[in-house]
Structure formats: structure tokens, C-alpha cells
A protein has these predicted regions:
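Small-polar-interrupted transmembrane alpha-helices in polytopic inner-membrane proteins
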Residues: 15, 91-95, 148-161
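Juxtamembrane helix-entry segments on the extracytoplasmic side of multipass membrane proteins
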Residues: 105-117, 168-182
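Active-site His/Glu-centered metal-binding helix of metallohydrolases
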Residues: 17, 126-130, 134-135, 139, ...
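Membrane-interface helix/loop boundary segments of multi-pass membrane proteins
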Residues: 127-153, 196-203
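Functionally important transmembrane alpha-helices
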Residues: 175-231
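Specific transmembrane helices
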Residues: 3-124, 216-259
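Residue-level hotspots within the lipid-embedded alpha helices of multi-pass solute transporters
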Residues: 120-125, 153, 157, 180-185
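Hydrophobic core positions of alpha-helical segments in small-molecule transporters
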Residues: 7-10, 86-87, 148-152, 206-207
Length: 259
């Protein structure tokens, strides 16, 4: 079995087993998953399924040197501060542009964004060890970057599906699958941009956590238009910074400055 097949099997086994049990229990009892500590622990286990699978498969399949580099990329901060500024800007535009266009609600103080980041590193950010750190990396060895990003997006959408059946999740309460799917693809392109340009899993983790935190403060009205706006922006950023063909001289200078 190839590394990608092992990773996919492990990820979906961990997550679907954990979230599947929660979905069945919450539906039978008609209670939100957050009402039980045991259910919440199962929820977190499902969330970090991609990280567990990525680390496990990498340890068993890669050389000691490659595995060590993989782990280091997960926890070692990037020293170039320009990349952090880049991430802050693209995440804020990605999150707030739909909010201001289609409307929404600010549910807590802006200061909460920074305070929530550690929580969203655990609930969201660590996924990047598996999705971008392992799966995208392995796919890019075999197929073009754009195709790899699209494939990860599709798998990522399917991975989230149990959340739509768990009472108390944001997906169950507020989202529909088509709009959510567009949002996942949009976010995937943004994260791919960060990964392809930096090769840093740590920065992908921080990007995911920061974006989740912003979206938890500024909650946009769920609409097809909002999803399309986010998708257009993420594709724009991807094409500017990742697709090296037909790039303007100005954008190449911007790219050089960031690096």
C-alpha cells in the first residue's frame, strides 16, 4: 500500500470512527456534543486524525532524516517576519471581504482573535500536519501543484462530512454542504500558497488557526456569493504567488521582497 493510501485510510478511520460515534449518540439523545466531556474528547481525536496519520505514516515510511525534517517543519517557527505579515494580510482579506460584502455579525470583541489562536491550533491548525504537510507534499511529487491542491480539497471536503450530522457543530447548525465545499476549496488554495512558498508546516498550522479565530469573531452570512468571493480571492493569491508562468515583473519583485 502506498504512503498516500496508508495516510488516507488512517485519517478517515480515526476521524470517521470518532465522529461517527458522536453523530449517532447526539442524534439518538438529541443533545449537542459539547454537553459531554467524553464526546468532546472524541471530537478532538477526530480533528487531529490527519496529524496522527501523517506523523505515523511518515515515521514508518520515510528515512530518519526525512522524518526528522518533517517534524521540525511542524514546530519550528519561520524566522522571516515578512511571511507572518503576508499571512496576516491574506487571512484578514480572505475572512473579512465576504463579511463586508454579504454582511454578518461580530459576535465577540476583536481582541479575542489572538486569545483564541491556541485553541484553534488544536482544533484545526494541527490538521495541516496531515493535509498540507503530508498529503499535499506527497501528491506534488507525482502530479502538478494545481491538481494536487484540488485533490486535497476534495478529500478534505469528504473528511468534514460527519460534522454535518453531529448536533452542536457549526456545520450542523448553520452550514449547507455546497457553500461549505466552496469555502473548503477556497481555504485549501490559500493554505497551498503558504505551503508551496514556504515549505513550512508550522506556518500552515498558524494560518489555519488564525483564520479560524478570525472567522469565529466575524461570522459572515452564509451565502453562495460569499463563498465565491473567497474563492476568487484565494485563486488570485495562488496564481500570483505559486503559478510562476506569465507573472508580471512587479509581482516577481514582491515575491522576492517577501522571501
Amino acid at each position: 500500500m502506498s504512503k498516500l493510501k496508508k495516510y488516507s485510510f488512517s485519517t478517515f478511520s480515526i476521524t470517521f470512527l470518532s465522529w461517527g460515534m458522536i453523530a449517532v449518540y447526539t442524534q439518538i439523545k438529541n443533545i449537542p456534543f459539547g454537553s459531554s466531556i467524553a464526546l468532546y474528547i472524541l471530537y478532538i481525536l477526530g480533528v487531529i486524525g490527519p496529524a496522527i496519520a501523517g506523523i505515523t505514516v511518515s515515521k514508518r515510511s520515510d528515512s530518519k532524516e526525512d522524518f526528522s525534517m518533517f517534524l521540525k517543519s511542524c514546530y519550528q517557527p519561520t524566522k522571516n517576519l515578512n511571511w507572518y505579515l503576508f499571512i496576516i494580510v491574506i487571512v484578514l482579506v480572505f475572512s473579512l471581504l465576504p463579511y463586508f460584502v454579504v454582511g454578518g455579525e461580530q459576535i465577540v470583541l476583536v481582541q479575542i482573535i489572538l486569545l483564541q489562536i491556541p485553541i484553534f491550533i488544536l482544533i484545526g491548525g494541527l490538521e495541516e500536519i496531515g493535509w498540507r504537510g503530508f498529503m499535499l507534499r506527497e501528491l506534488t511529487k507525482r502530479i502538478p501543484a494545481l491538481t494536487s491542491t484540488l485533490l486535497v480539497s476534495i478529500v478534505w471536503i469528504f473528511w468534514h462530512l460527519p460534522l454535518f450530522f453531529i448536533i452542536g457543530t457549526y456545520q450542523y447548525e448553520y452550514l449547507n454542504i455546497p457553500v461549505f465545499s466552496i469555502s473548503v476549496i477556497s481555504f485549501s488554495f490559500l493554505l497551498s500558497t503558504v505551503y508551496y512558498k514556504t515549505k513550512s508546516i508550522f506556518l500552515c498550522i498558524m494560518t489555519h488557526a488564525f483564520c479560524n479565530s478570525v472567522l469565529n469573531v466575524f461570522v459572515s452570512n452564509q451565502s453562495l456569493l460569499g463563498g465565491i468571493i473567497a474563492l476568487v480571492f484565494s485563486l488570485f493569491i495562488y496564481l500570483l504567488f505559486v503559478n510562476n508562468s506569465n507573472r508580471s515583473l512587479i509581482m516577481k519583485k514582491v515575491d522576492t521582497y517577501i522571501e
